[in-house]
A protein has these predicted regions:
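An amphipathic, aromatic/His-enriched active-site/gating alpha helix that lines ligand/cofactor pockets
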Residues: 28, 57-90
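Short S/T/G/P-rich N-terminal loop/turn motif that feeds into the first structured element of a domain
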Residues: 1-35, 39-50, 84-95
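Short hydrophobic/aromatic beta-strand micro-patches
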Residues: 8, 55-57
Length: 95
């Protein structure tokens, strides 16, 4: 299953000016997701907006939550299951 994840923090919790904190939090998210066995199809960031975006393939919501754990103290995450748009449109138009 494919999930779209948005993580948001604010300027008060932003670790950008503390390299050690960046390494311990957001710097650990991709390795942590990989450790959970998740496939990360893409990861993007909007630095001035304090937003991170991930597309992750997983069989387990719980594994995603565990994989995001290093960044949990920094803000909030929205984890949404999504499906292929073209495939959905084909199903809709064929029924």
């Amino acid at each position: 299953m494919i999930f779209h994840i948005t993580h948001h923090h604010d300027e008060k919790t932003c670790p950008a000016h503390d390299p050690d904190k960046v390494a311990a939090t957001f710097g650990q998210v991709l390795p942590s997701l990989a450790e959970q066995g998740e496939t990360v199809h893409g990861a993007w960031v909007d630095p001035p907006g304090h937003d991170f975006f991930f597309v992750v393939e997983s069989e387990s919501y719980e594994a995603i939550v565990e994989g995001l754990f290093p960044a949990v103290p920094m803000g909030t995450a929205r984890i949404q299951p999504v499906e292929d748009f073209k495939a959905r449109m084909q199903k809709v138009t064929q029924s």
